[in-house]
Amino acid sequence: MAEPRVFLKENRGRIEENYLEQAKNLPRVFAPVDEKLQKCTEEVALACKYLYAFMPYSDIGNYPFEVFLDYAENGVRLWKENPQVADLPEEIFLNYVLFHRVNEEEIAQCRTYFRAEIGSRIQGMNFREAALEVNYWCAEEATYHCTDDRTLSAISVYRRGNGRCGEESVFTVNALRSVGVPARQVYAPKWSHCDDNHAGRDLV
């Protein structure tokens, strides 16, 4: 009989060590975080610790615990319910499915909501098929519009229905990650039909 899978078995020690180091540097900030982690399942708590261990200090200071909890809970659920996600190398899962940040965008809860919206459309699909379907969904929900403001969160692009290339790619990467498809944002320098770098998304 096969042994049951252990969530983040290979990286557990590294995550705990880096989280404790962050907490040591910011004890007053992490005290309430530790209290809230005690109310989470072991897997969700570990996912949250990964986010806090490797996020920039600005994210720690600017956003409440509940924002990151959404990313952690969705990531754990994907790992438990989708064998394709559970089979991913841990480094790919951590960096390109679970992690909350894509670029320098505003961070807001979105993963659980996006999964609920997209999930039925990709039922039974492999990653490649799911990626195409997610791309179609994103095209239905948001179109290109040039802006100069700070990069919006993925959920704000969805609600507004448009965004510049960087915002559209942040939206799409979050949508892909919300259903377990590993993805990241990439830039194409000297893109022929625009003035500067052109943002897109890349499946890992």
Pin down the residues of each PLM region.
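Hydrophobic/aromatic-rich core segments of domains that either
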Residues: 120-121, 125, 130-136, 146-155, ...
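N-terminal accessory/pre-domain segments preceding catalytic cores
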Residues: 1-133, 140, 147, 178
